[in-house]
Every structure is written in C-alpha cells, then in structure tokens.
Amino acid sequence: MKLRAVVLGLATLCTSTATFAGMVSTSSNLEFLAIDGQKASKSLGKAKTFTVDDTQNHQVVVRLNEIVGSGSNQSLFESNPVIVTFQGNAEDLVISAPVIRNLDSGDKFNQMPNITVKTKSGNAISAKVDVLKQEGLFPSGNVLNDLAEYNASGAAASVSKFAATTVASSVAVAPAGNAKANKGKVVVQGENVAEQQLQYWFQQADKETQTRFLNWAKSHK
C-alpha cells in the first residue's frame, strides 16, 4: 500500500508540473515576421507553424498580404507589422485575420488590426494586439530592433523578457572608420538611420547588385 501511495504521489506530481505543447498556425493571408523575439526563419515561413509552451506567454509579429481589387486594377496590399501576444495552449492555435478585398479595408486594418487567436476547436484565446510602428528607409529590415524597443516600452502587447532580443545579423553603428563587414556582422556609420541602412543593405548585396547600384547612384547625382 505504501509503495502504491508513493507511485500515485509521483504520478500526480509529474502531471501537475508537466507542460504541453501546441502548434500555432495562421490564416493563409498572414505571414510570421518574428516569433518570441526571434526572426521567423524562411523554412518556418513556408510551413507557417511553430510549437508553443502552454505555460508561457508568446509573442509573434505578423503581416497581412492580400491581392485586392479586380482585373487590371489588382494590386498587392501589405499591412503594417502587427504584434500579437497570447498565452500558450496545449491545444493547437490558429491566428487569423479577415479577408481584405480593397485598399479602403486595408487602411482600416492598418489603423485597427482585427486579429483573433482561437483553438482548433473554435474557442477564443485572449490576445493583445498592437501595431509595430516603424520608421526608416527599409523598415522591414528593422523588425527585431523595433520589436525589442517596443517590448522595453511597456506598451499594451509588450513582453519584457523579449526586450533584450538582438538581431542575429545586426547592424552595429561604428563611431568612426569606413563601413565594412566583420566576420558576418555588418558595421556601418552614418549621420542618420537612412544612411546607415543604405550601407547595411549595400553590404548584404552581391557584387553585381552593388555595381548596378553604384551606376544608378552616379546617374542620379
């Protein structure tokens, strides 16, 4: 009897401390830009799923992509990045956005993103949603930096533990010296963000692209 009681006690303890993982996916018009402070990998972007811990808060940045209009008036609408923060769940979750059929609807979505998080069985999960405001010449390249600043601000959908997240291929601003690549880390200098970003993306490009850009720059002096 004592042995049985010990076994039952251990089983109860293990059950009470166990964590369960659910899969998170999105509606077809959403793409992941960041997951829990990290850039969404290309392979993950195609699969559009990742695993979450049901005991933790999770945060994703998504963007809505939709072909709007009809016939010769069709165009691609890309929303501003949207932050979604939610509690993990043992059941699979789906992050969804409504279908956008015209640019007016797209503008309304940008002003007030309508994004929901539900379990596969249809139960709504509480989520905090906010727009990730961005500036600069190439805002899409600064998602992680902007997200880290957002998380440090204490805003509505922020998660403080992700505030210190750094970009794997980060842009380091050098106080002096010419822009150069150093062991995979791009080092730039400049008087403003736009100049720094130009230097960063120039160094990311291949030689042919760099040459074409330089020729273009010369022709626009």
UniProtKB/Swiss-Prot annotation:
Signal peptide: 1-21
Keywords: Signal
PANTHER family noted in UniProt: UPF0319 PROTEIN YCCT
Species name: Haemophilus influenzae (strain ATCC 51907 / DSM 11121 / KW20 / Rd)
NCBIfam families reported for this sequence: PRK01904.1 (NF002516)
Origin organism lineage: Bacteria, Pseudomonadati, Pseudomonadota, Gammaproteobacteria, Pasteurellales
Protein family: Belongs to the UPF0319 family.
Name of protein: UPF0319 protein HI_1681
